[in-house]
Amino acid sequence: MQLIKALKGHTDRAWAASVHPNLPLLATCSGDKTVRIYNTNNWELVTTITEGHNRSVRSVAWKPSGSSPSLALGSFDSTVSIWGKEDDEWQFLAAIEGHENEVKGVSWSCDGQLLATCSRDKSIWVWEADDMNDEFECISVLQDHTQDVKHVAWHPSEMVFASASYDDTVRLWREDDDDWICVADLGGHESTVWGCAFEPSEGSDLRLVSCSDDKTCIVWKKEGQVGGTGDHSGIRPAFRADPLSEEWIQQATLPEAHTRAIYSVAWNKNGRIASTGADGKLVVYKENGPGQWVVESEVENAHGVYEVNDVVWLDDKLVTSGDDGVVNIWEV
């Protein structure tokens, strides 16, 4: 991997980044309470959002639909704000309140109609957005996790999302009779689960990767699907909660590559997984056969001596956000 651009400008740690699915836009968020938006064609700064939050902006997510770009920001001030571009100006559209503590993650459904938010208050809220992005109605409050919820991630093409928690589990959620329910409780990690990401594939095969404080990444597969080794001996299924629940198995554990907590994981359309974390390493894995993963490349000290908080794919490039306040772009 080769570093091709270092985006500097944040004055505190860079927490996360979000790549717009259709437009050449990258948003980064920081402990300096701001969000910076870049044009990914030339890496020029488009705008900086400096208002709306009085504590760290911990998470950022582009809405995947709509006639003009808009994004959600989740903050340690316990609120979520919605921003959008109107008449060539970036404007504040809505404030979403409900969580009692820091908002750790925000994620949009594939159709852009729903927004999931998660918090240190152990809850996940699901919000329904109107077409103008200025009215948000809470349609479900999910309190199955027993600890801080670190991350939420929707599937890129299906109406299902996953959550990762300090309670060492990943949970899968689907809609049922106008409410959202937990359909799987994945309990394979031995410590905090910091992040998770779905495989961005079409069709029936559902897979998810999760990363943890236990220094491992686990690939999960929805049971009953075609593929895999066919031998699940020694692989325990996830706990099944109720008759509507789904059974997921641990298909693989990625090769050990990290020496400290793994904070973030990302899966791209070409089948590669990237991970990063407290040891400052950036690692890319590829799958040689069903459930057979190898390390393809890695970078030590991707942000110098600093921890790396987040990794996302930008086509075949990688975007990492570090405690040094820098957002790095990597050619893989």
UniProtKB/Swiss-Prot annotation:
It is found in: Cytoplasm; Nucleus. WD repeats lie at residues 9-48, 52-93, 98-137, 144-183, 188-230, 257-295, 302-332. One of its GO terms (cellular component) is cytosolic [4Fe-4S] assembly targeting complex. It comes from the Eukaryota. Its main location: cytoplasm. Keywords: Cytoplasm, Nucleus, Repeat, WD repeat. Gene3D superfamilies: YVTN repeat-like/Quinoprotein amine dehydrogenase. GO terms for biological process: iron-sulfur cluster assembly. HAMAP family: ciao1. Essential component of the cytosolic iron-sulfur (Fe/S) protein assembly machinery. Required for the maturation of extramitochondrial Fe/S proteins. Belongs to the WD repeat CIA1 family. Interacts with NAR1. This is Probable cytosolic iron-sulfur protein assembly protein 1. It comes from Yarrowia lipolytica (strain CLIB 122 / E 150).
